[in-house]
């Protein structure tokens, strides 16, 4: 709509691997784009570097803040993070999970321990805790301790085998509802849940019921 009503030219580039991040961002600079939007935390370094080198270009980064390389958030004059309070949705998921579990154990795990992942896990933990307080129950959360910020991570957003293995571990410990926060790795967890037959998966980032019908029920 903005292309026709405002006369804005829009360029797009899709990254097929990490090696594409920098060239894709720089191609936008070369094409004369004055607002460049990176989608996803993986593009943080490429967008950050380009913003430092091109002060007359504006940048935005979806789903991640900018950092100094040591996980300390930094502010850039010509770039802004676009972050969403996903803890709120995860809180509701945690509350419902605590109310639905038949074993008294639910679980969550992440891909990599970064803020855009742990914010989901924090919200889920708060939801479980709120249900326990409201209902006088003692539902246990596996995979994440909000207070210590310690938990389970696959160190990958791609390897579905790792998601399956992590879910199987939780299932063996008694969890019957699992919320993976690990992109496609979560589909491995869904496969484990389907194979078990008594475990439910909570999807993030999209409507998994529609996006992954093989695991809908």
Predicted stretch roles:
Residues 1-217:
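A residue-level marker of the well-folded mature domains of exported/periplasmic proteins
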């Amino acid at each position: 709509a903005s292309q026709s009503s405002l006369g804005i030219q829009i360029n797009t580039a899709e990254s097929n691997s990490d090696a594409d991040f920098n060239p894709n961002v720089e191609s936008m600079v070369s094409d004369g784009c004055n607002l460049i939007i990176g989608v996803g935390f993986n593009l943080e370094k490429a967008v950050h570097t380009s913003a430092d080198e091109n002060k007359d270009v504006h940048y935005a980064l979806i789903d991640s803040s900018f950092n100094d390389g040591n996980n300390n958030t930094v502010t850039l004059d010509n770039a802004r993070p676009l972050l969403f309070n996903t803890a709120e949705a995860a809180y509701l998921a945690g509350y419902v999970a605590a109310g639905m579990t038949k074993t008294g154990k639910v679980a969550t795990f992440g891909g990599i321990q970064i803020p855009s992942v742990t914010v989901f896990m924090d919200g889920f933990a708060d939801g479980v805790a709120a249900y326990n307080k409201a209902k006088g129950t003692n539902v246990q959360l596996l995979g994440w301790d909000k207070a210590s910020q310690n938990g389970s991570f696959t160190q990958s957003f791609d390897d579905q085998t790792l998601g399956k293995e992590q879910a199987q571990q939780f299932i063996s410990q008694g969890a019957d509802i699992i919320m993976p926060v690990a992109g496609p790795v979560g589909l491995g967890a869904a496969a484990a849940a389907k194979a078990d037959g008594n475990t439910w998966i909570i999807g993030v980032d999209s409507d998994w019921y529609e996006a992954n019908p093989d695991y809908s029920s």
